[in-house]
Amino acid sequence: LKDLKSRGLLDSTLVIWGGEFGRKPTRDRNGGDNPGRDHNAKAFSVVMAGGGVKGGVVHGATDDLGAESASDKVHVHDLHATILHLLGLDHEQLTYRFQGRDYRLTDVHGHVVKGILS
């Protein structure tokens, strides 16, 4: 980020780090040779910077355990809609045809998360 900023490129470059699921706050109870924390589809984190994103903003929160989203929930379709918006694309117009029907990449539920836009 420092390098992009020093070169004057951060405002025109969208940087994203994250994934579409988080990790459960508890350890798996199944034991075995590879104990760890399972996927958690109820809470995930994404870091975004530059390219139209407001700096220093935290959007949403989990419960006290970090197990589930508690406020300002963002669905993966919302994340995709927001990314497409920041890239200058209208997610509602971006479709693909499958089995004779047009589908949106963000389904019918995706909305741009306006609170993080600069």
Predicted regions and their residues:
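Ligand-binding pockets and gating/stacking loops
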Residues: L1-S118
